[in-house]
């Protein structure tokens, strides 16, 4: 029997979630390539794996079913149709070059599924090529250059796709370093036995198409309940994508209101969830310096089919969100400490917590001031180590792709 997928709130009971263990892709990071791969620093992978397993154990202890991206990709690659579909899109003349594509594709069609999934996530350097070639592309590369790039940002499973109520988006991502992640996940959703017969709609996105300026990432998207969706517009998610997502949700009757939040285009606030996350039905934690400066816009179905009505909001974001949820106001816990500590704890994902159920969140132990304020507000904060994981600029919210979450 197929599972019924859907994420119907930000804090309802979390039932099933997808994560990705730190592995080969993160071990490919170097001081010379980490910025190109969207990391600020290299990571001690062994320690990051320990921290990540502690994070997974914390969720499992509270009854969450945790599935792993790499394992699901391996299981998907055991299906020949799925393997061919994905390799046709990952290994071709445009991606690896004339003279290499056919031979490499043929080789990868035959290898063990686990080895293949390792390559699809961890990359393949010229030195690791399993076939001989005199192709133009391979000829000009050094042994350390990548034929297939590593995808270290797969650890942030939140971004690649996002479940909005009973459907999902397959996100066209902002930077080249992340765009292939969506192709991998699309293969899982299309062919894996857990998903292929589940019958869920795709609201937006298609790895077969270019979406131009319409880019989106899941860290900006929050189905908050009451048929409302919160979407950040900043460094990664554009107004072009927000309009298309809203139009699709309205056309299907899934949402009645999308609140678009204009963010500064800065690294520290690359996604909405780096400065704003829910901890309880009526409680959010925010980095006030950014959130109080957000311009909010309410999108609703237009008078004519297929149109969207857009209106600027004059109230602060927290009041707009409270109104959308039918609440008199939200309780707000700001990043803790003085100005120096607040900036540090926001940078270290103090406001990027993931709720396991109403009033219970997981966050990094290093954010002592913010965690203390949350506890004083009645939130149970389960802390996990993040000395290495935090170097990637993502906390519990970023590292989880909720697949099944209850409504409130």
UniProtKB/Swiss-Prot annotation:
The keyword Transmembrane helix does not apply. Pathway: Amino-acid degradation; L-arginine degradation via ADI pathway; carbamoyl phosphate from L-arginine: step 1/2. GO terms for biological process: arginine catabolic process to ornithine; arginine deiminase pathway. The keyword tRNA processing does not apply. Keywords: Arginine metabolism, Cytoplasm, Hydrolase. Its EC number is 3.5.3.6. Its main location: cytoplasm. One of its GO terms (molecular function) is arginine deiminase activity. It is found in: Cytoplasm. One of its GO terms (cellular component) is cytoplasm. Disulfide bonds: none annotated. Gene3D superfamilies: Arginine deiminase (1.10.3930.10), L-arginine/glycine Amidinotransferase, Chain A (3.75.10.10). It catalyses: L-arginine + H2O = L-citrulline + NH4(+). The active site is at 398 (amidino-cysteine intermediate). Belongs to the arginine deiminase family. HAMAP family: Arg_deiminase (MF_00242). This is Arginine deiminase. The lineage of its organism: Bacteria, Pseudomonadati, Pseudomonadota, Alphaproteobacteria, Hyphomicrobiales.
